[in-house]
Protein backbone atom coordinates (compact mmCIF):
# COMPACT_ATOMS: atom_id res chain seq x y z
CA UNK A 1 0.00 0.00 0.00
CA UNK A 2 1.43 3.39 -1.00
CA UNK A 3 1.76 6.46 1.19
CA UNK A 4 -1.48 8.43 1.63
CA UNK A 5 -1.64 11.67 -0.41
CA UNK A 6 -5.30 12.60 -0.04
CA UNK A 7 -7.03 15.22 2.15
CA UNK A 8 -5.48 15.25 5.63
CA UNK A 9 -8.51 16.77 7.35
CA UNK A 10 -10.57 13.72 6.36
CA UNK A 11 -8.09 11.48 8.18
CA UNK A 12 -8.01 13.45 11.43
CA UNK A 13 -11.80 13.65 11.50
CA UNK A 14 -11.83 9.87 11.55
CA UNK A 15 -8.80 9.13 13.73
CA UNK A 16 -8.34 12.24 15.85
CA UNK A 17 -5.41 14.64 16.16
CA UNK A 18 -2.26 13.47 14.32
CA UNK A 19 0.38 16.19 14.78
CA UNK A 20 2.82 14.48 12.44
CA UNK A 21 0.35 14.50 9.56
CA UNK A 22 -1.04 18.03 9.96
CA UNK A 23 -0.98 20.84 12.49
CA UNK A 24 -4.74 21.24 12.07
CA UNK A 25 -7.11 19.80 14.66
CA UNK A 26 -10.33 17.94 13.84
CA UNK A 27 -13.53 19.96 14.11
CA UNK A 28 -16.45 17.59 14.35
CA UNK A 29 -19.95 18.85 13.70
CA UNK A 30 -22.51 18.08 16.36
CA UNK A 31 -24.24 14.81 15.66
CA UNK A 32 -21.46 13.63 13.33
CA UNK A 33 -19.25 10.56 13.27
CA UNK A 34 -18.77 9.92 16.99
CA UNK A 35 -22.46 10.30 17.80
CA UNK A 36 -23.55 8.14 14.89
CA UNK A 37 -21.29 5.30 16.01
CA UNK A 38 -21.83 5.66 19.77
CA UNK A 39 -24.81 3.33 19.76
CA UNK A 40 -23.12 0.71 17.60
CA UNK A 41 -20.88 -2.00 18.94
CA UNK A 42 -17.44 -1.42 17.47
CA UNK A 43 -15.61 -4.65 16.66
CA UNK A 44 -12.23 -5.41 18.21
CA UNK A 45 -10.82 -5.69 14.70
CA UNK A 46 -11.91 -2.15 13.87
CA UNK A 47 -10.43 -0.81 17.11
CA UNK A 48 -7.07 -2.41 16.29
CA UNK A 49 -7.28 -1.29 12.66
CA UNK A 50 -7.89 2.34 13.59
CA UNK A 51 -5.01 2.31 16.08
CA UNK A 52 -2.75 0.91 13.35
CA UNK A 53 -3.96 3.60 10.97
CA UNK A 54 -3.14 6.29 13.53
CA UNK A 55 0.45 5.09 13.63
CA UNK A 56 0.72 4.80 9.87
CA UNK A 57 -0.77 8.20 9.02
CA UNK A 58 0.97 10.09 11.83
CA UNK A 59 4.44 8.90 10.78
CA UNK A 60 3.59 8.82 7.07
CA UNK A 61 4.81 5.28 6.52
CA UNK A 62 3.56 2.66 4.11
CA UNK A 63 1.87 -0.58 5.10
CA UNK A 64 4.95 -2.51 4.04
CA UNK A 65 7.26 -0.31 6.11
CA UNK A 66 5.05 -0.65 9.17
CA UNK A 67 4.86 -4.43 8.85
CA UNK A 68 8.65 -4.52 8.54
CA UNK A 69 9.01 -2.43 11.72
CA UNK A 70 6.70 -4.84 13.56
CA UNK A 71 8.85 -7.78 12.47
CA UNK A 72 12.03 -6.03 13.62
CA UNK A 73 10.38 -5.12 16.94
CA UNK A 74 9.32 -8.73 17.54
CA UNK A 75 12.94 -9.88 17.21
CA UNK A 76 14.30 -7.16 19.51
CA UNK A 77 14.65 -7.32 23.28
CA UNK A 78 12.03 -5.54 25.34
CA UNK A 79 8.41 -4.62 24.71
CA UNK A 80 7.45 -5.16 21.07
CA UNK A 81 5.10 -2.18 21.13
CA UNK A 82 7.66 0.17 22.64
CA UNK A 83 10.36 -0.90 20.19
CA UNK A 84 7.89 -0.36 17.34
CA UNK A 85 7.32 3.22 18.50
CA UNK A 86 11.06 3.79 18.88
CA UNK A 87 11.68 2.61 15.32
CA UNK A 88 9.04 5.03 14.06
CA UNK A 89 10.23 7.94 16.20
CA UNK A 90 13.90 7.56 15.26
CA UNK A 91 13.25 7.97 11.54
CA UNK A 92 15.08 11.02 10.20
CA UNK A 93 11.91 12.73 8.95
CA UNK A 94 10.31 12.40 12.38
CA UNK A 95 13.44 13.62 14.21
CA UNK A 96 13.47 16.74 12.03
CA UNK A 97 9.79 17.30 12.83
CA UNK A 98 10.31 16.82 16.59
CA UNK A 99 13.22 19.29 16.50
CA UNK A 100 10.84 21.91 15.07
CA UNK A 101 12.71 22.17 11.78
CA UNK A 102 9.53 21.34 9.83
CA UNK A 103 5.80 21.90 10.55
CA UNK A 104 4.82 18.28 9.85
CA UNK A 105 6.46 14.96 9.01
CA UNK A 106 5.51 15.29 5.29
CA UNK A 107 7.21 18.71 5.41
CA UNK A 108 10.29 17.15 7.00
CA UNK A 109 10.29 14.39 4.38
CA UNK A 110 10.34 17.03 1.66
CA UNK A 111 13.39 18.70 3.24
CA UNK A 112 15.20 15.35 3.26
CA UNK A 113 14.18 14.45 -0.31
CA UNK A 114 15.39 17.85 -1.56
CA UNK A 115 18.77 17.29 0.12
CA UNK A 116 18.57 20.16 2.61
CA UNK A 117 19.59 17.96 5.57
CA UNK A 118 22.93 16.57 6.70
CA UNK A 119 23.50 13.84 9.28
CA UNK A 120 27.00 13.80 10.75
CA UNK A 121 28.11 16.19 7.98
CA UNK A 122 26.86 13.95 5.16
CA UNK A 123 23.78 14.66 3.04
CA UNK A 124 21.09 12.07 3.73
CA UNK A 125 18.14 12.01 1.33
CA UNK A 126 16.38 8.95 2.79
CA UNK A 127 13.50 9.97 5.10
CA UNK A 128 13.40 6.52 6.72
CA UNK A 129 17.08 6.73 7.75
CA UNK A 130 17.24 5.45 11.32
CA UNK A 131 18.91 7.98 13.59
CA UNK A 132 21.16 6.79 16.42
CA UNK A 133 22.35 8.34 19.68
CA UNK A 134 25.01 11.01 19.07
CA UNK A 135 23.89 11.63 15.48
CA UNK A 136 23.81 15.35 14.75
CA UNK A 137 21.51 16.94 12.21
CA UNK A 138 22.47 20.15 10.43
CA UNK A 139 21.29 22.26 7.52
CA UNK A 140 22.99 22.26 4.13
CA UNK A 141 25.27 25.29 3.87
CA UNK A 142 23.19 27.08 1.26
CA UNK A 143 21.10 30.21 1.70
CA UNK A 144 17.92 28.56 0.40
CA UNK A 145 18.20 25.66 2.84
CA UNK A 146 18.98 27.90 5.80
CA UNK A 147 16.14 30.32 4.98
CA UNK A 148 13.51 27.57 4.71
CA UNK A 149 14.46 25.88 7.97
CA UNK A 150 15.04 29.10 9.91
CA UNK A 151 11.48 30.17 9.05
CA UNK A 152 10.15 26.78 10.10
CA UNK A 153 11.93 26.99 13.45
CA UNK A 154 10.64 30.51 14.04
CA UNK A 155 7.03 29.49 13.44
CA UNK A 156 6.85 25.85 14.50
CA UNK A 157 9.39 25.25 17.28
CA UNK A 158 6.79 26.17 19.90
CA UNK A 159 6.36 22.99 21.86
CA UNK A 160 9.06 21.64 24.13
CA UNK A 161 11.64 19.51 22.36
CA UNK A 162 11.60 15.98 23.84
CA UNK A 163 14.40 14.96 26.19
CA UNK A 164 16.06 12.58 23.75
CA UNK A 165 16.77 15.49 21.37
CA UNK A 166 18.59 18.82 21.67
CA UNK A 167 18.59 21.78 19.30
CA UNK A 168 21.17 24.58 19.33
CA UNK A 169 19.76 27.71 17.68
CA UNK A 170 23.23 29.25 17.71
CA UNK A 171 24.82 26.39 15.76
CA UNK A 172 21.58 25.49 13.93
CA UNK A 173 22.24 21.93 14.94
CA UNK A 174 20.09 19.12 16.30
CA UNK A 175 21.48 16.26 18.37
CA UNK A 176 20.07 12.83 19.16
CA UNK A 177 20.98 12.33 22.81
CA UNK A 178 19.58 8.84 23.30
CA UNK A 179 16.87 6.38 22.30
CA UNK A 180 13.62 7.88 23.50
CA UNK A 181 11.47 6.41 26.25
CA UNK A 182 7.72 5.79 26.11
CA UNK A 183 6.86 9.12 27.75
CA UNK A 184 8.52 11.06 24.92
CA UNK A 185 6.38 9.58 22.13
CA UNK A 186 4.72 12.35 20.14
CA UNK A 187 1.43 10.52 19.57
CA UNK A 188 -1.42 9.39 21.79
CA UNK A 189 -1.70 5.72 20.88
CA UNK A 190 -2.12 2.22 22.29
CA UNK A 191 0.76 0.44 20.59
CA UNK A 192 -0.30 -2.97 21.96
CA UNK A 193 -3.39 -2.84 19.74
CA UNK A 194 -1.13 -2.28 16.73
CA UNK A 195 0.98 -5.31 17.67
CA UNK A 196 -2.19 -7.37 18.11
CA UNK A 197 -3.42 -6.27 14.68
CA UNK A 198 -0.28 -7.71 13.09
CA UNK A 199 -0.13 -10.79 15.33
CA UNK A 200 -0.88 -13.18 12.45
CA UNK A 201 1.21 -11.37 9.84
CA UNK A 202 4.52 -10.64 11.56
Curated annotation (Swiss-Prot):
Q: What is this protein called?
A: Small ribosomal subunit protein uS4c
Q: What does this protein do?
A: One of the primary rRNA binding proteins, it binds directly to 16S rRNA where it nucleates assembly of the body of the 30S subunit. With S5 and S12 plays an important role in translational accuracy.
Subcellular location per the Swiss-Prot or TrEMBL entry: Plastid, Chloroplast
Q: Which GO terms describe its biological process?
A: ribosomal small subunit biogenesis; translation
Q: Which Pfam families match?
A: Ribosomal_S4, S4
Q: Which GO terms describe its molecular function?
A: rRNA binding; structural constituent of ribosome
Q: Which residues form the S4 RNA-binding domain?
A: 90-153
Database matches in InterPro entries: Ribosomal_uS4 (IPR022801), Ribosomal_uS4_bac-type (IPR005709), Ribosomal_uS4_N (IPR001912), S4_RNA-bd (IPR002942), S4_RNA-bd_sf (IPR036986)
What keywords is this UniProt entry annotated with?
A: Chloroplast, Plastid, Ribonucleoprotein, Ribosomal protein, RNA-binding, rRNA-binding
Summarize subunit and interaction data from the UniProt record for this chain: Part of the 30S ribosomal subunit. Contacts protein S5. The interaction surface between S4 and S5 is involved in control of translational fidelity.
Species in which this protein is naturally found: Sphaerocarpos donnelli
**PROSITE patterns attached to this UniProt entry:** S4
So what family is this one in?
Answer: Belongs to the universal ribosomal protein uS4 family.
The UniProt entry, under NCBIfam families, shows: PRK05327.1, rpsD_bact
Cellular component (GO) terms are:
chloroplast; small ribosomal subunit
User: Which gene holds the coding sequence for this protein?
Assistant: rps4
